[in-house]
Curated annotation (Swiss-Prot):
Keywords: DNA damage, DNA repair. GO terms for biological process: DNA repair. It comes from the Eukaryota. InterPro entries: Him1/Fmp52 (IPR014843). The keyword DNA damage applies. May participate in the control of processing of mutational intermediates appearing during error-prone bypass of DNA damage. This is Protein HIM1.
Amino acid sequence: MSYSVNTFTDYVLLFGSSSLVGKGILENLLDINLYIKNVSDLQGKLDSLSEIKGNVVLNKHVFCVNRRCINEEKSFMKTIDYINMRSVTWQGGRYYLRSRKEKDTEKVPSSPNTFCYDNFEEGFIKNTPEERGKDGYSFVYNQKQFSYTLHYACGKEKGIEIICNFTVTQLIIPRSETWPKLLPRIFSGTQKLEKFDIDNKNYVPGRSLPSLCDISTMVCSLGSTSARVRRTQVPSSFADYYLPFNLAQEFTNTTNKRLVVTTAFNNDFLSKTFEYFRIKAKLENDLDEALPNKLKELVILRPGPMCGQHGNPINVELGKENSTFLEKIFYYPHYLLVYKKKYISEARRIGLRTKLSEIIASSIYRMPGSALLGYAVPVSKVSYVASLMAIERKSKEAGPKLEVISSYQIDMIV
Protein backbone atom coordinates (compact mmCIF):
# COMPACT_ATOMS: atom_id res chain seq x y z
CA MET A 1 0.00 0.00 0.00
CA SER A 2 1.44 3.40 -0.95
CA TYR A 3 0.97 6.49 1.17
CA SER A 4 1.18 10.15 0.22
CA VAL A 5 3.73 12.49 1.81
CA ASN A 6 0.91 13.83 4.00
CA THR A 7 0.15 10.42 5.53
CA PHE A 8 1.51 9.33 8.92
CA THR A 9 1.04 5.88 10.41
CA ASP A 10 1.66 5.00 14.06
CA TYR A 11 1.50 1.53 15.61
CA VAL A 12 1.10 0.73 19.31
CA LEU A 13 1.36 -2.71 20.92
CA LEU A 14 -0.81 -2.98 24.04
CA PHE A 15 -0.55 -5.83 26.52
CA GLY A 16 -2.99 -6.01 29.42
CA SER A 17 -5.98 -4.31 27.79
CA SER A 18 -8.34 -6.49 29.85
CA SER A 19 -6.88 -5.25 33.15
CA LEU A 20 -8.26 -2.40 35.23
CA VAL A 21 -5.60 0.03 33.97
CA GLY A 22 -5.37 -1.46 30.47
CA LYS A 23 -9.06 -0.97 29.69
CA GLY A 24 -8.66 2.74 30.29
CA ILE A 25 -5.45 2.89 28.25
CA LEU A 26 -7.20 1.33 25.26
CA GLU A 27 -10.14 3.74 25.59
CA ASN A 28 -7.78 6.71 25.68
CA LEU A 29 -5.59 5.60 22.76
CA LEU A 30 -8.75 5.37 20.63
CA ASP A 31 -10.20 8.66 21.89
CA ILE A 32 -9.84 11.52 19.40
CA ASN A 33 -9.94 14.02 22.28
CA LEU A 34 -6.63 12.71 23.66
CA TYR A 35 -4.93 13.87 20.47
CA ILE A 36 -6.61 17.27 20.11
CA LYS A 37 -5.99 18.19 23.76
CA ASN A 38 -2.36 17.00 23.71
CA VAL A 39 -1.11 18.12 20.33
CA SER A 40 2.64 17.45 20.58
CA ASP A 41 2.28 14.37 18.35
CA LEU A 42 0.16 16.24 15.78
CA GLN A 43 2.39 19.32 15.96
CA GLY A 44 5.50 17.23 15.32
CA LYS A 45 3.95 15.76 12.19
CA LEU A 46 2.90 19.17 10.86
CA ASP A 47 6.39 20.53 11.55
CA SER A 48 7.83 17.86 9.25
CA LEU A 49 5.76 19.11 6.29
CA SER A 50 7.20 21.88 4.13
CA GLU A 51 3.95 22.03 2.15
CA ILE A 52 0.51 20.49 2.46
CA LYS A 53 -1.25 19.25 -0.66
CA GLY A 54 -4.67 17.82 0.08
CA ASN A 55 -5.58 16.25 3.41
CA VAL A 56 -3.23 15.28 6.21
CA VAL A 57 -3.97 11.66 7.13
CA LEU A 58 -3.16 10.19 10.54
CA ASN A 59 -3.47 6.40 10.83
CA LYS A 60 -3.50 5.18 14.44
CA HIS A 61 -3.27 1.39 14.85
CA VAL A 62 -3.52 -0.30 18.25
CA PHE A 63 -2.79 -4.03 18.52
CA CYS A 64 -4.08 -5.75 21.67
CA VAL A 65 -3.05 -9.26 22.61
CA ASN A 66 -5.39 -11.08 25.01
CA ARG A 67 -6.07 -14.59 26.22
CA ARG A 68 -9.80 -14.24 25.59
CA CYS A 69 -11.99 -11.97 23.50
CA ILE A 70 -13.16 -8.70 25.07
CA ASN A 71 -15.17 -5.67 23.89
CA GLU A 72 -15.64 -7.03 20.38
CA GLU A 73 -18.96 -5.21 19.94
CA LYS A 74 -18.08 -2.02 21.82
CA SER A 75 -18.11 1.30 19.99
CA PHE A 76 -15.12 3.58 20.62
CA MET A 77 -16.57 6.60 18.79
CA LYS A 78 -16.47 9.79 20.88
CA THR A 79 -17.99 13.25 20.59
CA ILE A 80 -15.29 15.76 19.70
CA ASP A 81 -14.58 18.22 22.53
CA TYR A 82 -14.21 21.52 20.67
CA ILE A 83 -14.05 23.53 23.91
CA ASN A 84 -10.90 22.02 25.44
CA MET A 85 -8.94 21.51 22.23
CA ARG A 86 -5.44 22.96 21.69
CA SER A 87 -4.38 24.96 18.64
CA VAL A 88 -1.54 23.98 16.31
CA THR A 89 0.89 26.07 14.28
CA TRP A 90 2.23 25.69 10.76
CA GLN A 91 4.52 28.05 8.85
CA GLY A 92 3.87 30.98 11.17
CA GLY A 93 0.08 30.61 11.29
CA ARG A 94 -1.96 29.44 14.28
CA TYR A 95 -4.76 27.03 13.46
CA TYR A 96 -7.82 26.34 15.61
CA LEU A 97 -10.15 23.36 15.46
CA ARG A 98 -13.55 24.26 14.01
CA SER A 99 -16.84 22.39 14.11
CA ARG A 100 -17.07 19.60 11.59
CA LYS A 101 -18.98 20.33 8.40
CA GLU A 102 -22.30 18.57 8.07
CA LYS A 103 -21.26 16.59 4.98
CA ASP A 104 -18.31 15.07 6.85
CA THR A 105 -20.55 13.34 9.39
CA GLU A 106 -22.05 11.09 6.74
CA LYS A 107 -21.12 7.45 6.97
CA VAL A 108 -18.47 6.37 4.46
CA PRO A 109 -19.45 3.31 2.38
CA SER A 110 -17.43 0.20 3.13
CA SER A 111 -14.59 -0.69 0.76
CA PRO A 112 -11.27 -2.55 1.13
CA ASN A 113 -9.26 0.70 1.02
CA THR A 114 -11.47 2.93 3.16
CA PHE A 115 -11.64 3.27 6.94
CA CYS A 116 -15.29 3.47 7.95
CA TYR A 117 -17.27 4.58 10.93
CA ASP A 118 -17.48 1.64 13.30
CA ASN A 119 -16.58 -0.95 10.68
CA PHE A 120 -16.12 -4.40 12.24
CA GLU A 121 -14.49 -7.55 10.91
CA GLU A 122 -13.21 -10.81 12.32
CA GLY A 123 -11.25 -13.79 11.13
CA PHE A 124 -8.15 -15.77 11.99
CA ILE A 125 -4.37 -15.72 11.69
CA LYS A 126 -2.26 -18.74 10.84
CA ASN A 127 1.41 -19.32 10.09
CA THR A 128 2.47 -18.62 6.51
CA PRO A 129 3.76 -21.26 4.03
CA GLU A 130 7.22 -19.66 4.30
CA GLU A 131 7.36 -20.85 7.91
CA ARG A 132 7.26 -24.56 7.12
CA GLY A 133 9.29 -26.51 9.64
CA LYS A 134 8.30 -24.25 12.55
CA ASP A 135 5.55 -24.90 15.07
CA GLY A 136 2.21 -24.05 13.51
CA TYR A 137 -0.22 -21.56 15.00
CA SER A 138 -3.76 -20.45 14.31
CA PHE A 139 -5.88 -18.07 16.34
CA VAL A 140 -8.73 -15.63 15.87
CA TYR A 141 -8.76 -11.85 15.72
CA ASN A 142 -11.30 -9.07 15.50
CA GLN A 143 -10.87 -5.54 14.26
CA LYS A 144 -12.74 -2.25 14.49
CA GLN A 145 -12.14 0.82 12.33
CA PHE A 146 -13.55 4.33 12.57
CA SER A 147 -12.63 7.81 11.36
CA TYR A 148 -12.89 11.50 12.14
CA THR A 149 -12.37 14.56 9.96
CA LEU A 150 -10.88 17.58 11.74
CA HIS A 151 -10.98 21.08 10.28
CA TYR A 152 -8.28 23.45 11.54
CA ALA A 153 -8.65 27.06 10.38
CA CYS A 154 -6.33 30.07 10.43
CA GLY A 155 -8.52 33.07 9.71
CA LYS A 156 -11.01 32.80 6.86
CA GLU A 157 -8.66 31.83 4.06
CA LYS A 158 -6.26 29.20 5.41
CA GLY A 159 -7.27 25.75 6.56
CA ILE A 160 -5.88 22.27 7.18
CA GLU A 161 -8.10 19.21 6.98
CA ILE A 162 -6.89 16.25 9.03
CA ILE A 163 -8.38 12.78 8.67
CA CYS A 164 -7.81 10.56 11.70
CA ASN A 165 -8.25 6.85 11.04
CA PHE A 166 -8.33 4.58 14.09
CA THR A 167 -7.93 0.81 13.91
CA VAL A 168 -7.92 -1.53 16.90
CA THR A 169 -7.00 -5.16 16.24
CA GLN A 170 -7.46 -7.70 18.99
CA LEU A 171 -5.42 -10.91 18.72
CA ILE A 172 -6.81 -13.69 20.89
CA ILE A 173 -4.00 -16.07 21.89
CA PRO A 174 -5.14 -18.24 24.85
CA ARG A 175 -1.66 -19.36 25.97
CA SER A 176 0.12 -16.22 27.16
CA GLU A 177 3.41 -18.07 27.65
CA THR A 178 3.65 -18.29 23.83
CA TRP A 179 3.26 -14.54 23.24
CA PRO A 180 6.96 -13.55 23.29
CA LYS A 181 8.06 -16.15 20.73
CA LEU A 182 5.05 -15.51 18.50
CA LEU A 183 5.56 -11.74 18.48
CA PRO A 184 8.25 -11.58 15.73
CA ARG A 185 6.46 -14.25 13.69
CA ILE A 186 3.08 -12.50 13.75
CA PHE A 187 4.60 -9.08 13.10
CA SER A 188 6.96 -10.21 10.35
CA GLY A 189 5.61 -7.83 7.73
CA THR A 190 4.24 -10.68 5.62
CA GLN A 191 1.58 -12.11 7.96
CA LYS A 192 -1.92 -11.57 6.55
CA LEU A 193 -5.24 -11.41 8.34
CA GLU A 194 -7.72 -13.99 7.02
CA LYS A 195 -11.02 -12.12 7.30
CA PHE A 196 -14.48 -13.64 7.01
CA ASP A 197 -16.33 -12.65 3.83
CA ILE A 198 -19.99 -12.38 4.82
CA ASP A 199 -21.25 -12.42 1.23
CA ASN A 200 -19.39 -15.57 0.11
CA LYS A 201 -19.34 -17.24 3.56
CA ASN A 202 -15.62 -17.99 3.47
CA TYR A 203 -12.26 -16.60 4.60
CA VAL A 204 -10.26 -14.39 2.25
CA PRO A 205 -6.80 -12.82 2.64
CA GLY A 206 -6.97 -9.36 4.18
CA ARG A 207 -4.41 -6.74 5.14
CA SER A 208 -0.87 -7.60 6.15
CA LEU A 209 0.25 -6.94 9.69
CA PRO A 210 3.23 -4.58 10.02
CA SER A 211 6.77 -5.64 10.78
CA LEU A 212 7.82 -5.47 14.43
CA CYS A 213 10.56 -3.07 13.29
CA ASP A 214 7.84 -0.57 12.33
CA ILE A 215 6.12 -0.69 15.74
CA SER A 216 7.93 1.87 17.84
CA THR A 217 5.73 1.96 20.97
CA MET A 218 4.68 -0.75 23.39
CA VAL A 219 2.45 -0.26 26.45
CA CYS A 220 2.33 -2.93 29.15
CA SER A 221 -0.08 -3.07 32.09
CA LEU A 222 0.21 -6.79 32.77
CA GLY A 223 0.04 -7.96 36.36
CA SER A 224 -1.24 -10.69 38.63
CA THR A 225 -4.12 -10.82 41.09
CA SER A 226 -4.44 -13.12 44.08
CA ALA A 227 -7.61 -14.70 42.68
CA ARG A 228 -5.99 -15.50 39.32
CA VAL A 229 -2.92 -17.01 40.99
CA ARG A 230 -5.14 -19.20 43.15
CA ARG A 231 -7.33 -20.22 40.22
CA THR A 232 -4.59 -20.95 37.67
CA GLN A 233 -1.80 -22.08 40.04
CA VAL A 234 0.59 -19.94 37.96
CA PRO A 235 3.10 -18.02 40.14
CA SER A 236 2.51 -14.27 40.34
CA SER A 237 6.06 -13.69 39.08
CA PHE A 238 4.99 -14.90 35.61
CA ALA A 239 2.63 -11.96 34.94
CA ASP A 240 4.52 -9.49 37.13
CA TYR A 241 7.99 -10.12 35.72
CA TYR A 242 8.71 -12.91 33.21
CA LEU A 243 5.99 -12.17 30.65
CA PRO A 244 6.55 -8.37 30.51
CA PHE A 245 10.33 -8.77 30.39
CA ASN A 246 10.28 -11.45 27.67
CA LEU A 247 7.84 -9.39 25.58
CA ALA A 248 10.10 -6.34 25.92
CA GLN A 249 13.07 -8.49 24.91
CA GLU A 250 11.39 -9.47 21.63
CA PHE A 251 10.02 -5.97 21.09
CA THR A 252 13.43 -4.26 21.20
CA ASN A 253 14.68 -5.56 17.85
CA THR A 254 15.65 -2.03 16.74
CA THR A 255 17.10 0.98 18.54
CA ASN A 256 14.14 3.37 18.19
CA LYS A 257 11.77 1.77 20.71
CA ARG A 258 9.63 3.23 23.50
CA LEU A 259 8.14 1.18 26.33
CA VAL A 260 5.53 2.48 28.78
CA VAL A 261 5.08 0.08 31.69
CA THR A 262 2.92 0.21 34.81
CA THR A 263 4.51 -1.23 37.96
CA ALA A 264 3.84 -0.13 41.57
CA PHE A 265 4.96 2.38 44.19
CA ASN A 266 8.11 1.12 45.88
CA ASN A 267 10.98 1.82 48.26
CA ASP A 268 13.94 -0.08 49.72
CA PHE A 269 11.95 -1.35 52.70
CA LEU A 270 9.07 -2.70 50.60
CA SER A 271 11.31 -4.32 47.99
CA LYS A 272 13.29 -6.12 50.70
CA THR A 273 10.25 -7.16 52.75
CA PHE A 274 7.51 -8.13 50.29
CA GLU A 275 7.97 -10.41 47.28
CA TYR A 276 5.47 -8.48 45.12
CA PHE A 277 7.44 -5.23 45.42
CA ARG A 278 10.75 -7.06 45.03
CA ILE A 279 9.56 -8.54 41.72
CA LYS A 280 8.33 -5.15 40.49
CA ALA A 281 11.67 -3.55 41.41
CA LYS A 282 13.53 -6.31 39.55
CA LEU A 283 11.37 -5.76 36.46
CA GLU A 284 12.14 -2.03 36.45
CA ASN A 285 15.87 -2.62 36.88
CA ASP A 286 16.10 -5.33 34.22
CA LEU A 287 14.09 -3.36 31.67
CA ASP A 288 16.61 -0.56 32.10
CA GLU A 289 19.80 -2.63 32.38
CA ALA A 290 19.38 -6.24 31.20
CA LEU A 291 17.74 -6.04 27.77
CA PRO A 292 20.12 -7.15 24.97
CA ASN A 293 19.06 -4.08 22.96
CA LYS A 294 18.55 -0.91 24.96
CA LEU A 295 15.22 0.88 24.82
CA LYS A 296 15.48 4.42 23.49
CA GLU A 297 12.76 5.50 25.93
CA LEU A 298 11.58 3.67 29.04
CA VAL A 299 8.68 5.24 30.93
CA ILE A 300 7.80 3.65 34.28
CA LEU A 301 4.56 4.50 36.06
CA ARG A 302 4.55 3.74 39.80
CA PRO A 303 0.96 4.13 41.00
CA GLY A 304 0.07 3.54 44.63
CA PRO A 305 -3.20 1.86 45.70
CA MET A 306 -5.63 2.55 42.87
CA CYS A 307 -9.17 3.86 43.29
CA GLY A 308 -11.29 1.91 40.87
CA GLN A 309 -13.44 -1.15 40.48
CA HIS A 310 -12.03 -4.46 39.30
CA GLY A 311 -14.43 -6.84 37.65
CA ASN A 312 -17.97 -6.10 36.54
CA PRO A 313 -20.30 -3.40 37.95
CA ILE A 314 -22.96 -4.72 40.31
CA ASN A 315 -26.42 -3.75 39.06
CA VAL A 316 -29.55 -4.62 41.01
CA GLU A 317 -32.86 -2.92 40.24
CA LEU A 318 -34.78 -1.48 43.17
CA GLY A 319 -38.21 -2.88 42.43
CA LYS A 320 -39.92 -3.28 39.10
CA GLU A 321 -40.28 -0.56 36.53
CA ASN A 322 -43.02 1.97 37.38
CA SER A 323 -43.31 0.59 40.93
CA THR A 324 -44.56 3.00 43.57
CA PHE A 325 -42.47 4.46 46.39
CA LEU A 326 -44.22 2.21 48.93
CA GLU A 327 -43.54 -0.90 46.83
CA LYS A 328 -39.85 0.04 46.67
CA ILE A 329 -39.71 0.33 50.46
CA PHE A 330 -41.11 -3.20 50.85
CA TYR A 331 -38.68 -4.47 48.20
CA TYR A 332 -35.62 -2.84 49.82
CA PRO A 333 -34.65 -5.77 52.16
CA HIS A 334 -34.73 -8.14 49.18
CA TYR A 335 -32.65 -5.64 47.18
CA LEU A 336 -29.99 -5.56 49.92
CA LEU A 337 -29.86 -9.36 50.06
CA VAL A 338 -29.44 -9.72 46.28
CA TYR A 339 -26.82 -6.95 46.21
CA LYS A 340 -24.88 -8.57 49.06
CA LYS A 341 -24.83 -11.95 47.30
CA LYS A 342 -23.59 -10.42 44.04
CA TYR A 343 -20.99 -8.33 45.87
CA ILE A 344 -19.58 -11.37 47.69
CA SER A 345 -19.59 -13.42 44.48
CA GLU A 346 -17.72 -10.70 42.58
CA ALA A 347 -15.25 -10.24 45.46
CA ARG A 348 -14.46 -13.96 45.43
CA ARG A 349 -14.01 -13.92 41.66
CA ILE A 350 -11.47 -11.08 41.61
CA GLY A 351 -9.95 -11.89 45.02
CA LEU A 352 -10.72 -10.59 48.50
CA ARG A 353 -7.28 -8.97 48.71
CA THR A 354 -7.92 -7.02 45.51
CA LYS A 355 -11.37 -5.92 46.68
CA LEU A 356 -9.93 -4.83 50.03
CA SER A 357 -7.25 -2.75 48.30
CA GLU A 358 -10.01 -0.99 46.31
CA ILE A 359 -11.82 -0.03 49.51
CA ILE A 360 -8.63 1.15 51.23
CA ALA A 361 -7.51 3.19 48.21
CA SER A 362 -10.85 4.98 47.95
CA SER A 363 -10.90 5.77 51.67
CA ILE A 364 -7.35 7.21 51.87
CA TYR A 365 -7.25 9.16 48.59
CA ARG A 366 -5.73 12.60 49.34
CA MET A 367 -6.15 12.06 53.09
CA PRO A 368 -3.44 13.51 55.40
CA GLY A 369 -0.72 10.95 56.13
CA SER A 370 -2.08 8.48 53.57
CA ALA A 371 1.22 8.52 51.64
CA LEU A 372 2.65 6.23 54.33
CA LEU A 373 0.50 3.46 52.81
CA GLY A 374 1.38 4.52 49.28
CA TYR A 375 -0.11 7.59 47.62
CA ALA A 376 -3.54 6.49 46.35
CA VAL A 377 -4.54 7.56 42.85
CA PRO A 378 -7.64 7.02 40.66
CA VAL A 379 -7.13 4.30 38.08
CA SER A 380 -8.53 6.64 35.40
CA LYS A 381 -5.56 8.97 35.96
CA VAL A 382 -3.06 6.10 35.70
CA SER A 383 -4.61 5.03 32.38
CA TYR A 384 -4.63 8.58 31.06
CA VAL A 385 -0.99 9.30 31.91
CA ALA A 386 0.12 5.95 30.41
CA SER A 387 -1.74 6.83 27.19
CA LEU A 388 -0.27 10.32 27.21
CA MET A 389 3.28 8.95 27.49
CA ALA A 390 2.58 6.55 24.61
CA ILE A 391 1.64 9.31 22.16
CA GLU A 392 4.16 11.95 23.23
CA ARG A 393 6.51 13.16 20.52
CA LYS A 394 9.58 10.92 20.33
CA SER A 395 12.64 12.14 22.19
CA LYS A 396 15.44 13.65 20.07
CA GLU A 397 18.08 12.63 22.61
CA ALA A 398 20.68 10.23 21.24
CA GLY A 399 21.11 8.09 24.35
CA PRO A 400 18.59 5.94 26.26
CA LYS A 401 16.06 7.93 28.28
CA LEU A 402 14.52 6.73 31.55
CA GLU A 403 11.50 8.49 33.07
CA VAL A 404 9.91 7.38 36.34
CA ILE A 405 6.51 8.88 37.22
CA SER A 406 5.39 8.54 40.83
CA SER A 407 1.84 8.13 42.06
CA TYR A 408 1.77 11.74 43.28
CA GLN A 409 2.98 13.00 39.89
CA ILE A 410 0.30 10.95 38.13
CA ASP A 411 -2.34 12.57 40.34
CA MET A 412 -1.03 16.07 39.61
CA ILE A 413 -0.56 15.65 35.82
CA VAL A 414 -4.27 15.12 35.17
